[in-house]
Amino acid sequence: MTEPQRVTIYSAAYDRSPGASHRLLRQATQLYAPGLAEPALASGAHGKPYFPDAPQLQFSISHSGAYWLCAFSAAPVGLDVQQHRDCQKQALARRFFSLAEQAFLERTSHAPFFDLWCAKESYLKFTGEGLSGLEAVCTVSPEGGFPSVPGVNLQLLPLFAGYSACLCTASPAEIREQFL
């Protein structure tokens, strides 16, 4: 049996002030890896942030509404959070969701639009592809199961009322949560 991927998720109130996300990332990094000097931050080809001098520290950041989240692991990780809000869900689904995902939304009583969105975004953060690949990812299996993307583990996270969140890892994750 494969050992679970260990993931620590830090969450904090998010005030959207200039530099807030960077300050919170620095604080979370110091908690996750206390002996590590503050690592430099760089961005991959599609904008995924990483620490070039600390490749053993994989992380993913997301913020929405009043919350900021960051997942740390020794292996690649993707995390997304979305505040439930009024939006043109049908139009967005037609533009960014596969036909299987659109059908899933239609036959599901509580239409988990934001769960689907978070699953897609967390996968793209995991792979480092960026949001340009949003339409190409299908998070519903051919049998209609959700969340499901071959080769990865998608886990919906019930963190905050009125929000959806999803974690994407290479294997099932053992999650530890901590509020900053």
Named regions from a protein language model:
Residues 1-180:
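Core catalytic alpha/beta fold that binds nucleotide/phospho-ligands
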